[in-house]
Amino acid sequence: MTDLIAKTAIDRRLAEIISPVIEDLGFELVRIRLQGGKTATLQIMADRPEGGINVDDCADISTAVSAILDVEDPLEDAYHLEVSSPGIDRPLTRLKDFETFEGYEARLETNQPIDGRKRFKGVLAGVEKGEGGDEVLLNIEEGGETQTIGLNFDWLSDAKLVLTDELIAEMLRQKKDAGVQIENLDEAAFDEIETEAGEDNAAAKE
């Protein structure tokens, strides 16, 4: 079964540990990735159920996640913690994401070729139950005509929204609702916060 939130075994283990902590704060885990390197980087994306998350929220999540990871200690080596919002052209990792963003453009990639292709671009058209499980519906252009295809959710290896004016307007609305001052909005600062807590964790394990 597809798990776009956490792809590897260690990612899934980390998700089991931190998801309850994030949910207790009123947020949801969108994606988690442990990236290798001289010092590993633990990347966490989180959001509010209704959308819209700010820098202070990311800092609160980082503090709580750092605390539980210090207790559970699932990582043997040093790591750096990054907590971020999903961004405007966000990844779609949960079935409900394809319903929430129905009507917006997205790029989808499958594990195996379907009719000779693995990459699809079109407008999200919701979710429906299929014979083989939940299907993500996508309106695509073929030969100058629009047709709706269904891709089994378990076939997906990657999915992401496409940056459009309509999407930007919706994301800015969510950020405004989350308390971000739009006129002073710094997208780079908003979308990602690298916390000192993560750096402290790395130093402690060296």
Swiss-Prot record:
Transmembrane segments: none annotated. GO terms for biological process: ribosomal small subunit assembly; translation. It holds the Pfam family RimP_N. CDD domains: YlxS_C. The keyword Cytoplasm applies. It is found in: Cytoplasm. Its main location: cytoplasm. One of its GO terms (cellular component) is cytosol. It comes from the Bacteria. Keywords: Cytoplasm, Ribosome biogenesis. Gene3D superfamilies: Ribosome maturation factor RimP, C-terminal domain, RimP-like superfamily, N-terminal. InterPro entries: Ribosome_maturation_RimP (IPR003728), RimP_C (IPR028998), RimP_C_sf (IPR036847), RimP_N (IPR028989), RimP_N_sf (IPR035956). Belongs to the RimP family. Required for maturation of 30S ribosomal subunits. This is Ribosome maturation factor RimP. It comes from Paracoccus denitrificans (strain Pd 1222).
